[in-house]
Amino acid sequence: MVGTSGAGKSTLAAALARVLDAEFLELDSVFHQPGWVPLPREEFRRRVEAAVAGERWVIDGNYTSQVKDLVWARADTVVWLDLPRRTVMRRIIWRSLWRAAKRTELWNGNRERWRNFFSLDKEESVIAWAWQTHAATRAKLEAARADQGNSHLEFVRLTSPAAVRRFLRSAAPSPASGAPTSGAPASGVDQL
């Protein structure tokens, strides 16, 4: 599951993993250690490699320069959340406000800070990051989709919240066959 920050990758990936009865790994939860210290690259790669050694998994997060080679080599599908910037910004602003106000623990004791909410530095603020990297993320993923080295992957590009809901519904197995169906509601689909 890839896309710009705030697009809903983690929410969709967790819901998809439940629907598919697959393991779920949120790359941010591995990468961001206590105090927002990044996990050393070698250890990050080792943990991701162990996760993708499994039979069925859903992973969310970009980290293309660090682990794309490991994840995409074992993947069969890349789901790309390519939502409009206005949708992403609305979501990430509300999400960040909520998390900061509630002091929600994200990963390993880390929490969003109020001072970062107002920062224009993309290295400090996830809101600034989402705004400043939206176009570049889209261009990078367009290039990856066109790259013949990724021809073994099915790219599913979702460009609206309605498309996301339809995708998740289509991934839900039918009760009789276990095969995906477009008619069955999927757990968490209304939250997307």
What is the predicted role of each segment?
Residues M1:
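Hydrophobic anchor at the beta1->P-loop junction of P-loop NTPases
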Residues K9:
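Conserved lysine of the Walker
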Residues V19, A128-L192:
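NTP-dependent small-molecule kinase module
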Residues E23-V78:
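Conserved nucleotide-sensing/catalytic segment adjacent to the nucleotide-binding pocket
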